[in-house]
Amino acid sequence: MPNSERHGGKKDGSGGASGTSQPSSGGGSSNSRERHRLVSKHKRHKSKHSKDMGLVTPEAASLGTIIKPLVEYDDISSDSDTFSDDMAFKSDRRENDERRGTDRSDRLHRHRHHQHRRSRDLLKTKQTEKEKNQEVSKSGSMKDRLSGSSKRSVEGNDDYGKAQLSKSSSKESRSSKMHKEKTRKERELKSGHKDRSKSHRKRETPKSYKTVDSPKRRSRSPHRKWSDSSKQDDSPSGASYGQDYDLSPPRSHTSSNYDSYKKSPGSTSRRQSISPPYKEPSAYQSSTRSPSPYSRRQRSVSPYSRRRSSSYERSGSYSGRSPSPYGRRRSSSPFLSKRSLSRSPISSRKSMKSRSRSPAYSRHSSSHSKKKRSGSRSRHSSISPVRLPLNSSLGAELSRKKKERAAAAAAAKLDGKESKGSPIILPKKEKFEVKESGLESKKLPRGIKSEKSTPDTELVNVAHSNTEVKNCLDTGKVKLDENLQKHPVKDLKAQGTKDTKPVALKEVIVTSKETETSEKEALPPLPTITSPPPLPSTTPPPQTPPLPPLPPLPAVPLQPPLPPPQPPFSQVPVSNTSTLPSSPHPRTSTLSSQTNSQPLVQVSMKTQLSVTAAIPHLKTSTLPPLPLPPLLPGDDDMDSPKEMLPSKPAKKEKEQRTRHLLTDLPLPPELPGGDPSPPDSPEPKAITPPQQPYKKRPKICCPRYGERRQTESDWGKRCVDKFDIIGIIGEGTYGQVYKAKDKDTGELVALKKVRLDNEKEGFPITAIREIKILRQLVHQSVVNMKEIVTDKQDALDFKKDKGAFYLVFEYMDHDLMGLLESGLVHFSEDHIKSFMKQLMEGLDYCHKKNFLHRDIKCSNILLNNSGQIKLADFGLARLYNSEESRPYTNKVITLWYRPPELLLGEERYTPAIDVWSCGCILGELFTKKPIFQANLELAQLELISRLCGSPCPAVWPDVIKLPYFNTMKPKKQYRRRLREEFSFIPSAALDLLDHMLTLDPSKRCTAEQTLQSDFLKDVELSKMAPPDLPHWQDCHELWSKKRRRQRQSGIVIEEQPPSKASRKETTSGTAAEPVKNSSPAPPQPAPVKAEPGPGDAVGLGDITQQLNQSELAVLLNLLQSQTDLSIPQMAQLLNIHSNPEMQQQLEALNQSISALTEASSQQQDSESIAPEESLKEVPSVSVVLPPAEQTTPEASNTPADMQNMLAVLLSQLMKTQEPAGNLEENTSDKNSGPQGPRRTPTMPQEEAAACPPHILPPEKRPPEPPGPPPPPPPPPLVEGDLSSAPQELNPAVTAALLQLLSQPEAEPPGHLPHEHQALRPMEYSTRSHPNRTYGNTDGPETGFSATDTDERSSGPALTESLVQTLVKNRTFSGSVSHLGESNSYQGTGSVQFPGDQDLRFTRVPLALHSVVGQPFLKSEGNSNSVVHAETKLQNYGELGPGTTGANSSGTTLQWGGPAQSFGKPYRGAARVPPRGGRGRGVPY
């Protein structure tokens, strides 16, 4: 058996592996003859084998060619072994592994065969080599026995080893029998292949190899079949291989081996006869490689395999390498190993291509292929294509191949001599090395075997010996390759094996030794290769129980030269290690394959690194010592152990150098990330821990981060000290947000701090999510994360002391919530279009990337001063897969923006949830406040139901499936009244809002559809003028909250009264139809006429904040009674110190107002007079608005501080005037009473004072600090004053106000929100719009209310007084309007509660505005509508509800209480729901 094995092995090595094809070998030629023929005709046999492969499957050849790249890649991973023809080598390696397991002598023979190969007289040399190989096989078997396991055990392992991990002794006998069977089958196959090529038959003749392989093949067969199935080109070879294996282990292996051999590119290249056949073999080899698991099994299967493998596998590493079954046999028998070596060149060449794929393997194969090439050029010709790819991809490998060739030639000579001598007698060094390599390899594999037992047999065998390391490399590569490309791998291995066998016989032997040494060294620290080899050997024994191979240890000393080469191995192992992961049996086989293939690919450093890396990867318990796994990687790198054999030390070094170049190659795979192959990807990681890996890692990581535009700087490497912290701008779920400036660039950034102190689980999941998602989102409407920095100078400090790190974002000046709540800005319809367009574009982008934001709200929508919108805060975002049905949490999205399906418990939601949130924001942009404000889920659903209708199966069929449908039903069924409530917004916007707030998520429009809506489709952002945002103040949520708290604490109290008044209005609106219904009450604006006084108060919101209700009342009385009120008087009344500028402005205003008053007396068109007035007062500031607006400009003329006060007063006066008429305006300016109706203009005036009229109104007023409250004038005074004012206003003003109210268009949205709101509330009331939050206000009205909140707050008393005076004295439309006015005021006072107020909009004097407008409308005849308007205003002017309430309640109650008790109750109702009651009017 050993002999047949050897024959088979030799045949594999020379004929089977080499591909020496002796057609005359016939199935039944004597093994020795055939072996000789094979040896001599190894190349021919290869070519014939290739032809046979072609015969077997023309597809195989073509596929081999086609699959070549893949195979090459796989081979590259295995190529790194040592052969330029990695494919052949890999198949050969596998075979060699088997052979190694079978015989070290086989290995020696292979080496000799390699020498012969190098001698271009392959036939003669191979014949002699065959004889020598036969002898060597015998001696090799003895060697194996000496090594500590007989060839038989190797054979047995080969036979059953891959399939089962049997004891070496039992396996030896088995392998003998199997070898005989295999030999017969091989012979039969060869005779069958005879037609194709005698060389094939000769290959068959060495059935002993195949026999040995047959078990291996059996084990391989599944893989090979698998591989074959994977790669069709292998299908012939693979099929025959698999079939043979399946049919009869012996024969199948033989035939398979033979087929593999035939197919093996090695045989083809040796044959040199056919490049296509070579390709076929390549495919086959790929297949074989696929079966690499088999070779692995074999390796791991038998200790003898290990021992023999040590020398054989080194020489037979080629066979091991070649995926072909015979390749395994090679591993089993020395001869096969040798031929495998000669074949190897072809394999190597394929491997070279493969190398290009996998740097580690590439390197190995290139150096090995060099040796092989010198041995067998003919094969190379066929392999040439593979080589070229290898060369092109691995130029270093070419040089290394040349060196290897030279070394192989030298080794071949030595091998020839050694071969002639008994394998044991081989030059002691070489022989010893081979032996030692085999033994050591066996040791490791044995240990691995023991651990891995049957399943890991392949892997174990691979690891069995350093020689086996070659096989392991082959196997690992094969496995990896199998994983990557099963058939191509086989072919590559077969080719590589064949090619390398003749040329690399010596190389194989040397490689075995080297592999042994390097493996040993690799196993321990690769660095200590020369001296450490024994240590590694010792270490491997722990891995591999067989320490017996002490001779290998001496060999290792002989191999000291090898250790230096081994470091390259070590480096190569890294590559192998990478490959390893992909291999089916990663532990053992991977280790060895890593070791073998990687040395070539990676330099010693790399090898060392890879060894270290490999160790972690190698899970084999048999490889307990860390060094051992590296060794295996080294072996794998040495997968072309031929290179690593005793002669190969120098070659190995050369390979190492080349591998260094190959090391560079691994970098390319890095870029893809795992593109070359899973091994490659792992390789970078494995290498990463070591020196080279680090280099690779940065390259990998940087590009990754570069995806996030961070290519320039590595994330996490900078310290937060690089930034100057300017201030805190927000608070998030896991830290604060700071405004900062980059010290280097001067760029403003936002730093989001993430604390790790209190994190039980380390890094906060929300931060991880945000980082991960933001790196994938690059869009102009999505906030850009620039980098990540830490608060430590050194990353090591971060580990010691858990600090914080910061996400660095581009800085945005404002967020939408801060702007809306500030009242500093009024957005026009164009601005809203621009904002919504950008918002929906960003959301559509996220949804198309399959991300749900799940937290869209105003505070997460950022703006800069140029009007650019960005979506921020992706801490709750997640990847959305429409196909997966897994549930998500429904506790997402802030309650006010949460869609009904989440409120009802839906857990399988869609991107429609984000569209609902954006619909809420669209409504909020028009109403200036959240449209659904509740603090409980049930209450939120109630608010949604009131506006959008109750969820029911009629409109939402799937609602009945939701978990909480029955438990959270609204108290009553509501019909959908969204269109009525929002009738004041443009129809296109209303349509869009209607679609976005559809209850049924399946019918709700998508983000993409919103962009195609009439409202947004024609929006051109580039042509949009940026909104006039406050550049002096960054409006963020945190700032807004602080401001709100301040108002509530003291400033707000005064501010609140106006808010209360406005709230009253809002409340009344709410009462009518809680906030939402209030809009239908628009008729109430008539009372607003009488209430213009309150309107004025709202205009005076800021001043009102400063003044008491009584003071406001006095001021209103004064203003009303005295048309020629001097600024000093006003200042005194208000207890305000006015600067000269303010006084001048006020005087100018008064004059203009008086003029206007006269004009208004003459003309009922307050509009015309108002423009005059505005021109007179503040032409520059005046905006082209209705009279009220113009008045506002006047107010705006006033300086900032006094401006605010004057603006409040003037806005009140002007508002009153505008609504009332020119005369009324004059009266209003001088008298608060008349101003009540004109309150809208007054408010604008205040705005103008604080800021440009448009922007200033509400927002600037809030900034205005409330002055000392003026002495409260007695209510009677107010009444008297009011009477005087009404007298002035009576006919003309009333008419003007009525006209204004009836003609809301008179107040263009353009004018300040106050004016707008005052008039518009009336308009809307008249229209019976459901102006909820805005209530009466149109878009402008809402803006007005927002702006007026402060005015309202500051002048609630004034407004009420004005309204009262106006009502009483004016007798506008009659006592009804008078009463209506009082009522609305009364209601305002009583209804508004600071708690109910929305502080965000307290400044907005909507209520006042609505009141102002309402008195007129009320005159027209709807006290209810007045109340509604008030309610709306109240909601908006929550800030000053308290003050307004007190003032208005006191004053208003006196004369307004009796008038309309109805208004009050209405307001009460409205007031209670101002927030939640009105869907739109809910205070923020």
From Swiss-Prot:
Residue ranges of the Protein kinase domain?
A: 723-1016
Q: Name one Pfam family in it.
A: Pkinase
Region called Disordered, residue ranges: 1-462, 485-603, 616-699, 1046-1101, 1156-1199, 1218-1356, 1437-1484
Bias (Basic residues) ranges: 34-49, 107-119, 195-204, 365-380
Cite the record's Polar residues compositional bias ranges: 251-275, 576-603, 1156-1167, 1189-1199, 1325-1336, 1444-1454
Q: Where is the composition biased (Acidic residues)?
A: 72-84
| Phosphoserine, modified sites | 235, 248, 264, 273, 275, 300, 302, 309, 311, 317, 322, 324, 331-333, 337, 340, 342, 344, 382, 384, 399, 419, 422, 610, 640, 677, 681, 885, 1049, 1079
Q: Which residues form a coiled coil?
A: none
**Cross-link Glycyl lysine isopeptide (Lys-Gly) (interchain with G-Cter in SUMO2): located at?**
262, 506, 651
Query: This protein is called what?
Result: Cyclin-dependent kinase 12
